[in-house]
Regions:
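P-loop NTPase motor core
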Residues: 108-182, 187, 355-435
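Hydrophobic/aromatic beta-strand patches that form the interior of the parallel beta-sheet core
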Residues: 18-20, 45-47, 71-73, 169, ...
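A short acidic (Asp/Glu
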Residues: 56-58, 180-182, 286-288, 315-320, ...
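Glycine-rich P-loop/Walker A and Walker A-like loops and their local beta1-loop-alpha1 context
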Residues: 2-5, 12-51, 255-314
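Flexible glycine-/small-residue-rich
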Residues: 74-76, 207, 278, 385, ...
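C-terminal regions of RecA-like/P-loop NTPase motor modules
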Residues: 1-2, 214-300, 456-480
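Conserved inter-motif catalytic segment of the P-loop NTP-binding fold
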Residues: 42-141, 302-391
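Phosphate-binding/switch region of NTP-binding enzymes
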Residues: 168-226, 413-480
Length: 480
């Protein structure tokens, strides 16, 4: 997916120039090729000094499949002795006399630019329709033609952009500001970033003349050799709700309830303690991850105990259960919540305790879990948000509770998912991280939600809502 702002920029009337700049390996060429693929109706041409045509097809096989639509032109050192008269000034045209001016320059080291004859012919043939020309890279072309980048961009503007309304994309192999940035109508920068040893990629829209920039920065991936950017995170709901599709557990592991998460972590081992740590400004949508695990276990005859918090209180859990088509299994859930005299408990799946009693008897969750297991049988998952426990217990009592939970989980061969939010004390975070079997981080970056494993270490994945199965799920895309 190409950012909407870039598509709008290349779709508006008239000619324009767009610079794609970035250090080597940042994905500039792949984006340029993706633009050609997206604008096949614009007579796309790819002028390159990097590779031969065969090499381009070898590295980007989809271009070979598009040979009729996309023309790959290699920059070679040949002579150009063919010039044409200027057409009527009111008509769209290729201004070839600009190249004639270049040919008259008294420079013994000059290289003739014969491949532009092919470019001009192709643009001419396509008029009055507009064409798209990719120059990859301008440094390579200018080095070959022995001209400055400023001169070359001016030449392209005089010859193709203004008179023929050609769209020209210029690949630039550097990040610092240059004089041609001011000549171009649009500039985008591509970045590779390191986050704790994990690679992330970001595209920044520096300017797009005449286009509103609603999202100036996009995370993107180059997975499978294709460019794909990610929009700001937005919750989605299915048009029609369908029953939850369980993923079978094994003798040794519980499924996470999500196929992508299972592929990354191999499921959750029976008796394991899972830490789900969230960063600042992460939406409550992240509760979908533990709720998928709970739905998967309950749908296979198990049960779930959940310590209620604002993001997953009794009403939210009930809504999830009904949306997953598990209304007949509602009593396989047990939501433990703080007693509220103004909202008396009327549901069998809700258990309310006053705060003082909870503080003096922190194993209430385990007692409820044992009751539920005796009633329902099967596997059990316990979901605990330590934000509420932190308000009830002092530091040392909370640490003892964490260690007790870890031992109880392993001894009783259940699954515990501990939720640790950004606001929790660093000492508690450290204790949870140390005793966890799997440690997953969920963060928000440029309004896009990401996930990665601290234990075991994984790459970064972008979290997107997925309602394709008829219920709230997530899709995880590797950032490569």
């Amino acid at each position: 997916m190409i950012p909407e702002e870039i598509k709008n920029f290349l779709s508006h009337e008239g000619g324009s120039s767009l610079i794609i700049q970035g250090n080597p390996g940042s994905g500039k060429t792949i984006l340029a090729l993706e633009l050609m693929d997206a604008f096949l109706d614009c007579n796309p041409m790819y002028l390159t000094t990097r590779l031969t045509t065969d090499a381009v097809y070898r590295y980007f096989p989809r271009l070979r499949q598009r040979q009729k639509e996309i023309n790959v032109i290699e920059s070679r050192d040949t002579f150009w002795d063919k010039f044409f008269a200027k057409a009527d000034s009111n008509e769209l045209r290729v201004e070839r006399d600009a190249f004639e001016m270049y040919g008259m320059l008294d420079d013994p080291d000059r290289t003739d630019i014969a491949e532009f004859d092919r470019v001009c012919d192709r643009v001419d043939e396509f008029l009055p329709e507009r064409s798209l020309l990719i120059l990859d890279s301008i440094e390579g072309l200018c080095d070959k033609y022995k001209v400055s980048e400023k001169f070359f961009v001016g030449l392209i503007n005089r010859c193709l952009i203004e008179p023929a309304h050609t769209k020209v994309v210029i690949v630039l192999e550097k990040m610092e500001k240059t004089e041609i940035d001011y000549l171009a109508d649009g500039v985008i920068s591509m970045h590779q970033m390191d986050r704790n040893g994990r690679r992330m990629r970001m595209l920044s829209i520096d300017k797009l003349r005449g286009i509103a920039i609603n999202q100036p920065n996009y995370l993107f991936t180059l997975k499978n050799g294709r460019f794909r950017s990610f929009n700001a995170f937005k919750i989605m709901y299915p048009e029609e709700y369908l029953p939850f599709e369980p993923i079978p557990n094994t003798k040794t592991h519980y499924s996470t309830g999500n196929r992508d998460l299972d592929e990354i972590f191999g499921g959750y081992q029976i008796g394991s303690y899972i830490l789900l740590e969230t960063g600042e400004n992460v939406d409550n949508f992240f509760y979908t991850l533990p709720m998928l695990t709970a739905a998967n276990i309950v749908s296979q005859g198990g049960s779930a105990v959940i310590l209620s918090v604002s993001g997953a209180g009794p009403s939210e859990v009930k809504n999830n259960v009904f949306e997953y088509g598990l209304s007949d299994r509602l009593n396989s859930f047990r939501v433990v919540t703080e007693e509220n005299p103004e909202e008396p408990v009327t549901e069998d799946f809700v258990v309310a305790y006053d705060k003082e009693r909870f503080a003096s008897n922190s194993n209430i969750l385990d007692l409820e879990l044992a009751k539920l297991r005796a009633e329902q049988g099967g596997d059990v998952v316990k979901i605990v948000d330590y934000e509420i426990l932190e308000t009830m217990l002092d530091m040392q009592a909370l640490k003892r509770t964490i260690l007790s939970d870890k031992k109880y989980t392993a001894a009783n061969k259940i699954l515990t998912i501990a939720i640790c939010k950004h606001s929790i004390a660093p000492e508690i975070k450290k204790t949870l991280a140390n005793i966890s079997d799997i440690h997953i981080r969920v963060n928000k970056y440029n309004d896009t939600m990401i996930l990665y494993g601290e234990k075991p270490t994984t790459s970064v994945y972008v979290i997107e809502p997925d309602v394709g199965r008829g219920y709230e799920d997530v899709k995880l895309t590797l950032m490569r």
